[in-house]
UniProtKB/Swiss-Prot annotation:
HAMAP family, A to Z: Transcrip_reg_TACO1
Pfam families: TACO1_YebC_N, Transcrip_reg
Main location: cytoplasm
Record protein name field: Probable transcriptional regulatory protein Mfl546
Subcellular compartments: Cytoplasm
Any one GO cellular component localisation term in the record: cytosol
Family to which the UniProt record says this protein belongs: Belongs to the TACO1 family.
Biased composition (Low complexity): 9-20
Length: 237
């Protein structure tokens, strides 16, 4: 299976609860990056990447600006990142990344969602995923992108063309180098520009209608939690 579904999943229409959660997680990420490296995206590459990611996820400009203003205004709020693993309906593997000011609250809420929605928060599944840099955009040919990346001598795993999109996958450590090379090529708008987890093996096809609905509900409930930043899984639903 290609990577176009990764981009589609990230850009799907969200419920009001999901939109609120998405705004909150973008705000926290941008706040932490600006607080650590300064408010200028031209010199703070981590902040620039998160702003690009927020824009591709249709986060309102005022949310981005407010997070940066908080970081530069002496706000002392701090967040801790944690990763949680579990199993979902259909023997699917799920990883949840949280960024929270209250670790106990985050852990309890994530565990509760698993337990109440046919999941198991005790599963160990991290070994089933790998961390990669992923970029998706339109407006360039595969040949143009390959030539640019080769000229830049950056480490890339794959370049695919799917549904009029160019999708570039690279080692997570190559994110800044690949992003810089693509920017030089003239890419101004990214459908995806982030470091994420993807399954090492093929995605699991969940064909049973009841299991599929149970899994979708579990993923939706996790995604709506205030402290959850990302939810990764190895299922096609």
């Amino acid at each position: 299976m290609g990577r176009a579904h990764e981009v589609r999943a990230a850009s799907m229409a969200k419920t009001a609860a999901k939109k609120s959660a998405a705004n909150g997680r973008a705000s926290k990420e941008i706040y932490m990056a600006a607080k650590a490296g300064g408010s200028d995206p031209s010199s703070n590459l981590a902040l620039r990447a998160l702003i690009d990611k927020a824009k591709s996820n249709q986060i309102p400009k005022e949310v981005i600006d407010r997070a940066i203003k908080r970081a530069t205004g002496g706000d002392a709020e701090n967040y801790v990142s944690n990763r949680y693993e579990g199993m979902g309906p259909g023997n699917t593997a799920i990883i949840v990344d949280a960024l929270t000011s209250n670790v106990n609250r985050a852990a309890a809420n994530i565990r509760e969602v698993f337990n109440k929605n046919h999941g198991n928060p005790e599963g160990k599944v991290a070994f089933m995923f790998e961390e990669v840099s992923m970029f998706a955009f339109k407006g360039k040919t595969e040949e143009e992108v390959l030539e640019q990346l080769m000229m830049s001598e950056v480490d890339v795993n794959d370049v695919e063309v799917e549904e009029d999109m160019i999708i570039v996958t690279a080692p997570y450590k190559s994110f800044n180098a690949v992003k810089h090379s693509l920017d030089e090529l003239g890419i101004e708008e990214y459908l995806m520009s982030e470091i994420k987890l993807i399954p090492i093996d093929d995605y699991i096809e969940v064909s049973d209608a009841e299991l599929k609905q149970q899994l979708q509900t579990l993923l939706d409930k996790l995604d709506e939690l205030e402290d959850v930043q990302n939810v990764y899984h190895n299922a096609t639903i």
